[in-house]
């Protein structure tokens, strides 16, 4: 892909990066490592290894090696997670490690530290309770002070809903304009978006048998996009929601500034 001008981004848990270090260093635009901890103990609790030994230091060492002479950006990802008992009571949370993790990310030379709320299997925000939210809120305030010109702390727009305990995201529009700009290509087929991958009535084609150009201009894709109604089909939190709101305003005539910031990863 890289040799043909296709930009490649990789998300990984980081445990086996050493096997592909040359490719990760030289053929990616970005690598984002899902760590979700800032210490061996918390890592083992939320990302346990079958050996019983925490892989935290192994992952951090491999990230450090990647960063030494990387060509693209390297990010440290932290999803806020909690463990619950059978009645839904919170037993523990990795949110206590947020500040430690951000400091580790900065120390090893990551370009950014990303904090995200957890979602359930249907893409609705996971309700983790007031105590976890308060813990995360405190740490998020602290780690913003770690930012510099070359190290950023980033959060998705959904973090604000997480802070407020809002688990759904109602939509005011009945079409998805973002789906005219992107899709989701997988081994099982090509879908309207990543949220509907695996859903047969949202499958616009199959790149195993047809070119993307043929899929994109097919009657099947046109028919499916006419049926997609975010008010009905997308009550979960969608990362493209703000983009859709802006596109709807642009369709009504709103003018926006054009920036020289072309990026294949829209």
Residue ranges with predicted function:
Residues 12-17, 80-83:
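Short beta->alpha connector loops
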Residues 4-7, 23-210, 226, 246-266:
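Radical SAM enzyme [4Fe-4S]-AdoMet core and its adjacent flexible, acidic
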Residues 212-214:
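Conserved ATP/PPi-binding loop(s) of AMP-dependent carboxylate-activating enzymes
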Residues 192-195, 230-243:
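Local cysteine-cluster metal-coordination motifs and their immediate loop/turn environment
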Residues 169, 216-236:
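Immediate flanking context of iron-sulfur cluster ligation sites
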């Amino acid at each position: 892909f890289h040799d043909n001008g296709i930009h490649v981004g990789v998300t990984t848990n980081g445990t086996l990066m050493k096997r592909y270090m040359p490719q990760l260093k030289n053929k990616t635009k970005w690598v984002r490592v899902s760590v979700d901890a800032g210490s061996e103990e918390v890592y083992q609790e939320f990302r346990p290894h079958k050996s019983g030994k925490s892989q935290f230091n192994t992952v951090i060492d491999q990230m450090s090696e990647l960063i030494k002479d990387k060509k693209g950006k390297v990010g440290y990802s932290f999803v806020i997670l909690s463990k619950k008992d059978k009645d839904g009571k919170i037993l523990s949370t990795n949110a206590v490690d947020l500040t430690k993790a951000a400091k580790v990310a900065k120390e090893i030379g990551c370009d950014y530290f990303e904090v995200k709320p957890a979602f359930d299997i249907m893409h609705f925000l996971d309700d983790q309770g007031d105590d976890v939210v308060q813990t995360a809120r405190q740490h998020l305030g602290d780690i913003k002070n770690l930012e510099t010109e070359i190290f950023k702390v980033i959060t998705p727009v959904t973090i604000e809903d997480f802070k407020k305990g809002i688990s759904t995201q109602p939509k005011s529009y009945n079409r998805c304009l973002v789906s005219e700009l992107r899709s989701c290509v997988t081994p099982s087929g090509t879908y309207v978006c990543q949220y509907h991958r695996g859903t047969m009535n949202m499958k616009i084609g199959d790149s195993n048998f047809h070119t993307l150009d043929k899929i994109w201009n097919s009657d099947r894709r046109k028919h499916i996009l006419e049926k997609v109604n975010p008010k009905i089909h997308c009550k979960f939190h969608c990362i493209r929601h703000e983009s859709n709101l802006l596109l709807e305003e642009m369709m009504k005539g709103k003018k926006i500034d054009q920036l020289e910031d072309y990026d294949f990863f829209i």
